[in-house]
A protein has these predicted regions:
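Hydrophobic, aromatic-rich transmembrane alpha-helices
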Residues: 298-306, 339-351, 403-420, 478-498, ...
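Membrane-interface alpha helices of multi-pass inner-membrane proteins
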Residues: 280-282, 315-330
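Active-site lumenal/periplasmic loops and adjacent helix-entry segments of GT-C-fold
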Residues: 5, 113-295, 330-334, 583-584, ...
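Membrane-embedded, hydrophobic transmembrane alpha-helices
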Residues: 1-103, 350, 359-365, 384-403
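Start-transfer (signal-anchor) and selected internal transmembrane alpha helices
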Residues: 66-130, 222, 226, 414-417
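Transmembrane alpha-helical segments
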Residues: 116-121, 234, 238, 328, ...
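Extracytoplasmic
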Residues: 540, 546, 550-706
Length: 706
C-alpha cells in the first residue's frame, strides 16, 4: 500500500543507495584526473541516471516488476566491473580523497541549499493532516498529482511504456524517467511519500553542486562562481517593489506574501511577474525540470572541458549523458542541442582561422536583418500597432535567421574539411554527435515526435508569456539587476566568454517566437538555460567592477546593496514556500477509499469517477479512471476530453442504458461521493441495479459492476 512498510522503506532506500554508490565508483574510475568533489558530482549524477535507465530498459522486455529491477542491478554490477577495465590504471582501491579549500567552500552553500530543499520538499509532499488527509504545499499543489500517477501507474500496469491512468487509451510520452526513478524505490514496498522525496533530494544536490562546479570551471575565480551561484539559487527581479508600496498605510500588502496563494515577488500574475524562482516554482514542483537541470549542468561541465579545454575524451561522456536526456527532460535535451550547436559553430569558425572580430559583424548583421524582417512583417500584416500579427513576424525572423545560420554552418564545415580538418572534427564533435543521435533518436521516435504532433505543440507565438508590458520592461522588472547588467557584461566579456554565452541568442530567439507546447509558460524551460549562461558572464562583470573600485569608500555597501536587490525577491518567495505547507489535497475520506482500493481491487481496474483535478485513486493507487482533469489533458496534448466528460456524465445519469459506454471504457467500479454528486446528476438507484456496493464509508460508496 502507499503507506509502505519498514522493510519496504529499507529495501527501497538500499536499492537507491547502491546505484548512487556505483555511480561514484564508476566516476572515480573514469575521471581519475579530476578533483574528488568533481568525481562525487559526476558520480551521483551517473548513479541517478543509471537508476532511471537500467530498470526501464529491462522493463521494456520483461515488464515493470521486481525481477526487472534485480536484473538491472546485475547489469549495474557489470558496469562497475567494466569501469575498472576502462580505467587507465585499474585499481579497485584507487580513491583519491584530496579536498581543496575551494571544494569545502563550495560544499557549504550547496549542502545548505540541499538541506533546505529537503525540508521544504518533505513538508510539501503527502504530509498527514490532523484529520487523516494529506497536505501538500503551494508550489506542488498543481503538478504533484500527475507525478504521483506516473510513479504508481507503471507498477500497477506492469509495463513500459505505460499509459496515462487519467486517459487510459493514451501512452505516456512525457519524459517519465524523472518519475519512474521513484517507482524503482516504491516497487520494493517503500512508502509512496519517501519514494517521491528521496530521489529529488539527490537531484537537488546534483543541481546545486553542478551549477557551482560549472561556474568554477568556467569563471576560474571562486568569488565569481559564488556570485553566479547566488544569482542562480536566489533569482528574482524587482517584484518585491509591489509589496513595499504603501507599507506604512497597509502592512497587509507585505504580509500577503506569506499568507496568500501565489502572491509572491517572483510569481505575481496580475502584475506580469512571471520569472519564477528556481527553487520555489521549478525545482520543488517540476521533477522533469529538476532532473533535467541535473543533466544540463553535468553535460555543460563535461562539454566545456571538451570544447574549451580541448579534453577530447569528455566528448564521449557528454554525448552519453546528452543522448540519455530526452526521456528525462525534452526541453533540456533541446537546450543542450542548441548550446552544443552554437559552441561547435564557434569552434569551426576559429578552426577556419577567421578573425574573431568578423564574428561580431556577422552577429550584428543578423540582429539588423532580424529587426528589418520583424518590422516589415508587422507593417505588412497590420493596419495599426494593436492589429499586428506578431506571431508571424517572430516566425519570419526565426526562419530567416535559422536559414542563414544553417548556411554559415555548412560553409564552415566545408571550409574546414577542405583545409584537412576532417580528423579533428570527427574525433571531437563527430563522435559526440554520433553518440547523441544513437541514444536519443529511438526515444524521440518512440515518444517525443508523436506527442509533438498534438494540438498546441510547436506553434508560432511571439513574446513568451508577456501580455501587458512593453517588451524590454517586462524582462527588466522580472529579471531585475541581471537584466540591467547583461549588456555592459557582454561588452566587458572576453572572447572565450562570448563564445560560451553565444547560445543565449538562439535560445531566446526560439523561446520568444515559438510555443513549444500547449502551455506557452513552459517556454521558460528553454529560457532558464540561457539565463544560467547569462549570470555567468554577469557575475564575471560584477566582480570585475568591484575590483576596479578598490580603494573607493563605500564599495562594500554598494556591492551589498546590489546583491540584496538581486536576491530579495527570491529570498522572500523562498520564505513563503517554507511556510506554504497548508493545502489539503486529499481529504481523510478520499485517503481511506484510496487505501481500500489499493488493497482490495485488481491492479488493472478502471474506475468511474468525476474528472476532478486531484484524484486520490489515480494518484495514490495507480488505478485508472475513465477521465481525469482537463488541465492535464490540455498541457499534455491529450485528445477527446469533452467526449470523455460526456460519456462519464451519461454513465452516471443513465447507467442502465449505458452498457455500451461501460464496455467501451472497460469500467469495473463506480465511485459515488460528494465530488461526483457535485459534478453530475447521479442516478444511484439505477447504479444499484447494475452493480454491487462493495465500499461505503464517510459518504463515499464504491460499486462493482455485476
Amino acid at each position: 500500500m502507499f503507506n509502505g512498510t519498514f522493510s519496504g522503506n529499507l529495501m527501497g532506500f538500499l536499492y537507491f543507495t547502491l546505484f548512487i554508490v556505483s555511480g561514484v565508483f564508476i566516476s572515480n574510475n573514469l575521471f581519475k584526473k579530476l578533483s574528488f568533489l568533481t568525481r562525487i558530482f559526476l558520480g551521483t549524477v551517473t548513479g541517478t541516471v543509471l537508476l532511471m535507465w537500467l530498470p526501464v530498459m529491462v522493463s521494456f522486455i520483461l515488464g515493470f516488476n521486481v525481477l526487472s529491477h534485480i536484473i538491472a542491478f546485475v547489469l549495474l554490477l557489470g558496469l562497475d566491473v567494466l569501469s575498472v577495465f576502462l580505467a587507465k590504471k585499474p585499481k579497485l582501491t584507487s580513491f583519491n580523497f584530496s579536498f581543496s579549500k575551494d571544494d569545502l567552500f563550495t560544499l557549504i552553500p550547496v549542502l545548505i541549499m540541499t538541506v533546505f530543499y529537503g525540508i521544504v520538499e518533505a513538508s510539501h509532499i503527502m504530509q498527514p493532516s490532523e484529520t487523516g488527509g494529506m497536505i501538500f504545499g503551494q508550489s506542488t499543489y498543481a503538478d504533484v498529482h500527475i507525478h504521483l500517477s506516473f510513479i504508481t501507474a507503471p507498477i500497477k500496469q506492469g509495463t513500459v511504456p505505460f499509459y496515462y491512468n487519467i486517459a487510459p487509451e493514451n501512452q505516456v510520452s512525457y519524459p517519465f524517467l524523472s518519475d519512474t526513478v521513484s517507482s524503482s524505490i516504491y516497487i520494493f514496498g517503500a512508502s509512496l511519500r519517501w519514494s517521491y522525496i528521496i530521489p529529488t533530494i539527490m537531484g537537488a544536490f546534483n543541481v546545486y553542486l553542478g551549477a557551482f562546479m560549472f561556474f568554477r570551471l568556467w569563471l576560474k575565480k571562486f568569488s565569481k562562481a559564488l556570485i553566479a551561484f547566488i544569482l542562480f539559487a536566489f533569482n528574482g527581479g524587482f517584484g518585491f517593489m509591489y509589496f513595499f508600496d504603501n507599507l506604512r498605510i497597509n502592512e497587509d500588502n507585505f504580509t500577503r506574501i506569506f499568507e496568500k496563494l501565489y502572491e509572491t515577488p517572483t510569481n505575481l500574475d496580475g502584475n506580469m511577474i512571471r520569472w519564477v524562482n528556481t527553487f520555489c516554482d521549478m525545482m520543488i514542483p517540476q521533477r522533469a525540470t529538476l532532473f533535467g537541470w541535473m543533466m544540463l549542468f553535468a553535460i555543460l561541465y563535461l562539454l566545456y572541458r571538451a570544447v574549451f579545454l580541448k579534453e577530447n575524451d569528455k566528448y564521449i561522456y557528454a554525448g552519453v549523458l546528452a543522448g540519455l536526456t530526452p526521456l528525462i527532460s525534452t526541453h533540456i535535451f533541446l537546450a543542450v542541442g542548441i548550446i552544443s550547436a552554437v559552441w561547435m559553430l564557434s569552434r569551426l569558425y576559429l578552426m577556419a582561422k577567421f578573425k574573431p572580430k568578423y564574428a561580431f559583424y556577422i552577429a550584428l548583421a543578423l540582429v539588423v536583418l532580424g529587426g528589418i524582417i520583424f518590422i516589415a512583417t508587422c507593417i505588412k500584416t497590420g493596419d495599426s500597432i494593436m492589429n499586428v500579427d506578431y506571431d508571424q513576424a517572430g516566425m519570419n525572423v526565426l526562419g530567416a535567421v535559422g536559414i542563414i545560420i544553417a548556411l554559415i554552418y555548412a560553409s564552415l564545415i566545408l571550409i574546414n574539411l577542405f583545409n584537412g580538418k576532417f580528423k579533428e572534427i570527427f574525433f571531437s564533435w563527430g563522435i559526440y554527435l554520433i553518440i547523441v543521435l544513437a541514444l536519443a533518436m529511438p526515444q524521440l521516435i518512440k515518444f517525443t515526435f508523436g506527442q509533438a504532433q498534438g494540438e498546441g505543440f510547436l506553434e508560432p507565438h511571439f513574446n513568451w508569456i508577456n501580455s501587458k508590458d512593453s517588451y524590454f520592461w517586462f524582462y527588466v522588472k522580472n529579471m531585475g539587476v541581471p537584466a540591467l547588467l547583461i549588456i555592459p557584461a557582454l561588452f566587458n566579456a572576453s572572447k572565450r566568454n562570448l563564445s560560451v554565452v553565444a547560445p543565449i541568442a538562439v535560445l531566446m530567439l526560439l523561446a520568444e517566437t515559438f510555443s513549444l507546447q500547449p502551455n506557452v509558460y513552459d517556454n521558460n524551460k528553454i529560457i532558464y538555460p540561457a539565463f544560467f549562461l547569462a549570470i555567468g558572464v554577469i557575475a564575471d562583470y560584477m566582480v570585475s567592477v568591484y575590483e576596479k573600485l578598490k580603494g573607493i569608500k563605500g564599495r562594500e555597501i554598494l556591492a551589498t546593496t546590489v546583491i540584496i536587490a538581486c536576491v530579495l525577491s527570491g529570498v522572500l518567495s523562498m520564505g513563503r514556500e517554507y511556510v506554504a505547507d497548508e493545502y489539503e489535497m486529499f481529504s481523510s475520506p478520499q485517503v481511506q477509499v484510496a487505501a481500500w482500493v489499493d488493497e482490495n481491487t485488481e491492479d488493472d481496474a478502471v474506475f468511474l469517477t468525476n474528472d476532478r483535478y486531484n484524484n486520490a485513486i489515480t494518484g495514490l493507487t495507480g488505478r485508472s479512471v475513465v477521465c481525469g482533469g482537463g488541465w492535464f489533458f490540455s498541457t499534455h496534448g491529450l485528445p477527446n476530453h469533452s467526449q470523455l466528460q460526456n460519456d462519464v456524465r451519461q454513465m452516471y445519469a443513465d447507467p442502465e442504458n449505458s452498457k455500451v459506454l461501460f464496455e467501451k471504457h472497460r469500467v469495473d467500479y463506480i465511485v459515488v461521493g460528494p465530488d461526483e454528486k457535485g459534478s453530475y446528476t447521479v442516478n444511484e438507484d439505477a447504479i444499484k441495479n447494475i452493480a454491487d456496493m462493495v465500499y461505503n464509508e464517510n459518504g463515499i460508496q464504491v460499486y462493482k459492476l455485476k
